[in-house]
Amino acid sequence: MIKKITKVTLCIILVVSAFSLLMAWRLDVFVKIDEKKPSTCEAIELYGSAEDIEIDYSNGTAYLSILDRKGLIQGKDVQGSIGRIDLNNMPWEIESVFSGEGLDNFRPHGLSIYGNTLAAINHPKERGKDPESIETFAISSKGIEHDKTLISPLLESPNDLVLVAEDKLYIGNDNMFNSNINSFEKIQQQLGRPYSTIVFYDGADMSIAAKNLASVSGLNVTEEGYIIASETNAKRMRVLKQLDDGKLEKLGAISLDGSPDNISISGDKIVVAQVASVSSLIQHFISLQKGDYKPSPSKIESLVFESDKSNYVRKREIMFLSLGEDISTASVGVQWDDKLLIGSITDDKIYVCQLGE
């Protein structure tokens, strides 16, 4: 009897230990941040934080998803905007090109550009209750003009999106609001079990393109047409192939040390922002709720994508890694010539660094 009890106790200890180690890995408890940054960086102040930045490389224009997310965390009723930078004219200045005109509410998140179309995820005031939407815009020399609003029950918790044509796009759902799973499954989801989806819009209707993903927080498309999706809870980027009917076939994955967020792609280079320490990010959000400020580390990594390699990566490089005292909670990194632009979840600025020094 005593031996049986001892075995049961040991099994319980092993299970608890394994669970604790898994949570420690998920939360980056043992991560040590050794800063690596360009020597020359400067901040451009904003009237909110730029969670996502998209560059139109054909004409050198950057679009920013701007919202007072710090105020949002503190329970304030805030409205956002889309900002624009002419990257060809120095010094860079940010102008607002859309502030929700014609919409009852505008709280932008992920952005995407294709040709003369810009698309933005728009969150409602009552997330989880009111419908999420995708707003599309026509781009012209004068600015951007709102075109249409796309709504579907499949948009449960949209985080990012990517246009693959002017009237076709993929939308990634993260794990914040998912009505299709129970409370126990939500706990498993936080541990990395994949319950998230990618939705396809074909110009008329929406459908599920891919299932069982670990919280999609970033989406983009390579020159060859592969969809790259951030699986934040699994610390990896998923490589997917577009099929003729819009569905996505899972091909493989790119492992990362951090939890990936937004992805930018230019040529064969992928630039991905990562949460370097989830535990620090949680502490950052808690401090904001209390009216304090505790920075969270920021990480930007570049990878040279090669579709015929087994791990899809020819080269990796840390472009920016800091404790967050210069820019905290980095959510996006985009490269323009020899400059790196970094946006943040909560910091009211973008950070611009000179590369190659």
Spans of model-derived segments:
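Asp-box/WD-like beta-propeller blade repeats and closely related beta-sheet repeat scaffolds
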Residues: 99-164, 172, 176-177, 183-185
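Beta-strand-rich domains and repeat architectures in extracellular enzymes and scaffolds
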Residues: 42-80, 327-332, 346
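Loop/turn-rich, solvent-exposed surfaces of beta-rich toroidal or solenoidal domains
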Residues: 257-320
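Beta-propeller blade signature
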Residues: 79-88, 131-141, 188-203, 292-308
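Beta-rich, blade/repeat-based domains predominating
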Residues: 47-56, 100-116, 152-168, 192-197, ...
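Blade-loop segments of beta-propeller domains
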Residues: 50, 69-71, 75-115, 119-124, ...
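Short, conserved, GDST-rich strand-edge loop motifs in beta-rich repeat architectures
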Residues: 64-78, 121-129, 171-193, 273-297
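A short helix->beta-strand "capping" segment at the edge of beta-propeller domains
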Residues: 27-49, 93-96, 144, 312-323
